[in-house]
Amino acid sequence: MFIIELIKGIILGVVEGLTEFAPVSSTGHMILVDDMWLKSSEFLGSQSAFTFKIVIQLGSVFAAAWVFRERFLEILHIGKHKHVEGENDQQRRSKPRRLNLLHVLVGMVPAGILGLLFDDFIEEHLFSVPTVMIGLFVGAIYMIIADKYSVKVKNPQTVDQINYFQAFVIGISQAVAMWPGFSRSGSTISTGVLMKLNHKAASDFTFIMAVPIMLAASGLSLLKHYQDIQIADIPFYILGFLAAFTVGLIAIKTFLHLINKIKLIPFAIYRIVLVIFIAILYFGFGIGKGI
């Protein structure tokens, strides 16, 4: 049984790595895969299972931090500046990089404030199957609207052309995504596209903005719940973290490579299908009624 439970931990890490930064809602998938199927709370205990989810989320966040490590160093004026997307050598020499630490901080402020104010309320009252389904569906519609609008925008902006107002509005949408199932990346990428960024630029800024705030939030949660970690459960934490980190690296790089080509509608359609599937399990078979 121990081996089977380890495999379950790895599966949850893989799911987290695949979905945390994709616009499909990692919360929705964790409810489907864990709460409705694998039920980590049954072999880890409810408190330890909650802490396990924090740890595997950190695996995904560290993956994003690694992918954007050079950009973070540049923002902090530590690394070498790389070329700006879409600009030639002369333009690069004459025009400084525009994305800076203030952009990131401006984008983080709304979610940071609302997170401090409402995190406990959201965790207590909004983490249920019906509310997650609502978030998945409404978020999908928002993504479709953003994609439909994007075809009308000529010469969409790159991430280095973002201004502070755009950063702030995208940050507000990150706060809206605190509703479980809405998806942080789905919300912020869609808003970025509506603010006339291209899909890759909106994704880049989404991930850059998300890493510090998610590190802070997950780190704080881990400090609150570290006493729930049992020595016997450490192998689950390690394997889950490594699975989330490894799969997260692959998923993030693949997503960034493809997003300007495939855009958001395929993810929106997938979310709607996922809502239907979860609804059948929940309303038709009563699976997850206790969540």
From Swiss-Prot:
Role summary: Catalyzes the dephosphorylation of undecaprenyl diphosphate (UPP). Confers resistance to bacitracin.
GO molecular function, one term: undecaprenyl-diphosphatase activity
Record flagged with keyword Cell membrane: yes
Top-level class of the enzyme under EC nomenclature: hydrolase
Cell location: Cell membrane
Protein's recorded name: Undecaprenyl-diphosphatase
Gene Ontology CC terms, in alphabetical order: plasma membrane
Domain of life: Bacteria
UniProt keyword list: Antibiotic resistance, Cell membrane, Cell shape, Cell wall biogenesis/degradation, Hydrolase, Membrane, Peptidoglycan synthesis, Transmembrane, Transmembrane helix
InterPro entries: UppP
Family: Belongs to the UppP family.
Transmembrane segments: 1-21, 48-68, 102-122, 126-146, 162-182, 203-223, 231-251, 267-287
GO biological process: cell wall organization; peptidoglycan biosynthetic process; regulation of cell shape; response to antibiotic
Organism of derivation: Staphylococcus aureus (strain JH9)
Miscellaneous comment as given in the Swiss-Prot or TrEMBL entry: Bacitracin is thought to be involved in the inhibition of peptidoglycan synthesis by sequestering undecaprenyl diphosphate, thereby reducing the pool of lipid carrier available.
Pfam families given in the database record: BacA
Enzyme Commission designation: 3.6.1.27
Its membrane topology: Multi-pass membrane protein
Reactions accelerated catalytically: di-trans,octa-cis-undecaprenyl diphosphate + H2O = di-trans,octa-cis-undecaprenyl phosphate + phosphate + H(+)
